[in-house]
Amino acid sequence: MTDTPTKQEIQSKNDNVPGATPVEQKKNNRNDRKRNRRGDSKNLERDSDWQERVVQIRRVSKTVKGGKKMSFRAIVVVGNEKGQVGVGVGKAGDVIGAVRKGVSDGKKNLVRVPLTPNNSIPTLSLGRDGAANVLIRPAAPGTGVIAGGSIRTVLELAGIKNVLAKRLGSKTPLNNARAAMVALSQLRTHKSASKERGISLEQLYS
């Protein structure tokens, strides 16, 4: 039966190599710091790909037994402009906390968007959320993002450069942003659409 090492022994193994000279121990510690720094830089590069935009910040209240409890609600859109985008909502007692929660919620609800070579969408799509309807159409190169409000923010952070969007129904920023997300989630490439329908690309275009 082998003896289990104590916490002090494990810590000493992690900090210093047994039997090593002070010069070797210093070199090992330097290498560990380099590895940690390299890992931190990779995480920073990964985080720098994402952009965050606050669509709306509102002060909301909740009636409780002792009176009204005030807090802030933030609607945040996150995306990497490479075909991934998400919408999140956060509530907290301060604005910074609400935005931070909104960013975290948005990264949990990401949607992957198929992009064409000219940074448009492959097909027309209609998304609905509550009383909001959003219609998005592909556009020719040089058209730009023809949309407004929270819909424009969602499309831009998804990496779409040429698109036509129309808001139908409700003007609520949250419902419109979520309706745009539904429309983007329904998009399919021509190849995947033909595969789902069991027909060839020639039959799809005919």
From Swiss-Prot:
Residues 1-15 have a biased composition (Polar residues). GO terms for biological process: translation. One of its GO terms (molecular function) is rRNA binding. Residues 38-50 have a biased composition (Basic and acidic residues). Residues 1-50 are annotated as: Disordered. Keywords: Ribonucleoprotein, Ribosomal protein, RNA-binding, rRNA-binding. InterPro entries: Ribosomal_Su5_D2-typ_SF, Ribosomal_uS5, Ribosomal_uS5_bac-type, Ribosomal_uS5_C, Ribosomal_uS5_N, Ribosomal_uS5_N_CS, Ribsml_uS5_D2-typ_fold_subgr. It holds the Pfam family Ribosomal_S5. GO terms for cellular component: small ribosomal subunit. It comes from the Bacteria. Residues 50-113 form the S5 DRBM domain. The keyword RNA-binding applies. Part of the 30S ribosomal subunit. Contacts proteins S4 and S8. With S4 and S12 plays an important role in translational accuracy. Located at the back of the 30S subunit body where it stabilizes the conformation of the head with respect to the body. NCBIfam families: rpsE_bact. The N-terminal domain interacts with the head of the 30S subunit; the C-terminal domain interacts with the body and contacts protein S4. The interaction surface between S4 and S5 is involved in control of translational fidelity. HAMAP family: Ribosomal_uS5_B. Belongs to the universal ribosomal protein uS5 family. This is Small ribosomal subunit protein uS5. It comes from Prochlorococcus marinus (strain MIT 9301).
